[in-house]
Amino acid sequence: NITFLCPVTVASYNGSEQQVSLVLEDGRELSAPILVAADGGNSTIRQQFNFPTREWDYGHSAIVTTVETEQVNQQTAWQRFMPTGPLALLPLDKAGDRHFCSLVWSQESAEAERLMALDDAEFCQALSHGSEHCLGKIVATDKRYSIPLRQRHATDYVVERVALLGDSAHTIHPLAGQGVNLGFADVAALVETLSVAAKRGNDLGSLMTLNKYQRQRKPENLAMMAAMEGFKRLFAADNLVVRFLRNMGLSQVDKIKPVKNGIIKRVMGL
């Protein structure tokens, strides 16, 4: 029971006491008791309904692309934390005997600009060195994109008839890949909230209903955002004592399976 409209552009939004309406560029009008905003970090819906946000610039940019590697990725993600930012290679399916990974390389903005200016051969060489040849040489790269990184958090996730979720409500540094997990958890919480409301015959888009979703997710998201900010600063530290204690602590956590598994389940939202 889903109608998928694509491509389509929304011309205007209008919220009323009983429903929210969208007017499309072709003149069609859509109405529903609730509008769910899942339109990304630069959410048009969030801006249209005047959700206030708190945000700041990390001073980092993420270089993203697809690269071909010399060695098989074994369907395993690889990440290296460097003082200038983390480098992650995420496994993709191979094509014949060629091996591919998705790259997310977060760097201080000036260094990211320098890397973006390199030609493909120079960039592959820099990436091979940065990744410590964990998958052999980087053989080739697709077109590169540089995305400025900002932390953003909506002070409220809901107003009457409208709910924000995922990146429209919060964005964090991609150093641990937690943005998508937070978004999935938002979806699960909102689905549960709306399911309970529907079974009880309650208004799906009322502020009373939607506040239950906000009360469940906002503290969880804030806690994860704070943890990731601390994580980022910990790995950016160049102090030898801090680096020694950090590495020793991580080594001990890796050896204590219940603690390690507990952390893994926590960040996966389980």
Residue positions per predicted region:
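Active-site-adjacent segment of FAD-dependent monooxygenases/related oxidoreductases
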Residues: N1
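A structural signal for the hydrophobic beta-strands that form the central parallel beta-sheet
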Residues: F4-C6, A37, L164
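Conserved beta-strand termini and adjacent loop/short-helix elements that scaffold enzyme active sites
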Residues: L5-T9, I138-T141
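A conserved short coil-to-beta-strand element within the FAD-binding core of flavoproteins
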Residues: C6-V20
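Conserved FAD-binding catalytic core of PHBH/FMO-like flavoproteins
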Residues: Q19-V23, R28-R144
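FAD/FMN-dependent oxidoreductases across multiple families
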Residues: E111-R200, L204-G205
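C-terminal helical "tail/cap" subdomain of flavin- and related membrane-associated enzymes
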Residues: E192-L270
